[in-house]
């Protein structure tokens, strides 16, 4: 099952009664056997795939783990990017004292790799396509912050003036491609960017 997750919705339930509404529970209302394959941050909108049975879940999870999927995101970052394309390979780890924040850590961080491409300049920033090669928590958000261009509306990593420019995080999972777990055929999906 492919869904276009809205911003400000959990992928899976959290702790507490107020954190039970999520993509997984909503999909289960129509597809009771649905299983989460991957997640998007609460503030991120865009494409997710859920498996409908254990075999499909295993196969799709393996594709994500082995990096055989294709994912691209669109974002609006704060400030004008000078370069047209680039890569960020700074290693990331959880900032345990400030969870759920992540930080760059060259000693203990895990390998993280993001490619980016400027699409156009916009007022207060640049619109970019982001391609995560790895899938670390908050990877795109921290890598863009590392470049000095945090994502507009990011309540975790952007300065106050960049947060004030949008009521939501300007990050959207626009494209998702993977091999269908039954047919093996390549599937490619896109979701319109809502900002």
Where are these regions (language model features)?
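RNA pseudouridine synthases
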Residues: 1-113, 120-123, 170, 195
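Pseudouridine synthases involved in rRNA/tRNA modification
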Residues: 6-11, 110, 137-195
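Short alpha-helix boundary/capping motifs
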Residues: 17, 134-135
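Loop/turn elements at beta-strand to alpha-helix junctions within RNA-recognition modules
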Residues: 54, 133-134
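Short histidine-centered loop motifs in beta-beta connectors
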Residues: 128-131
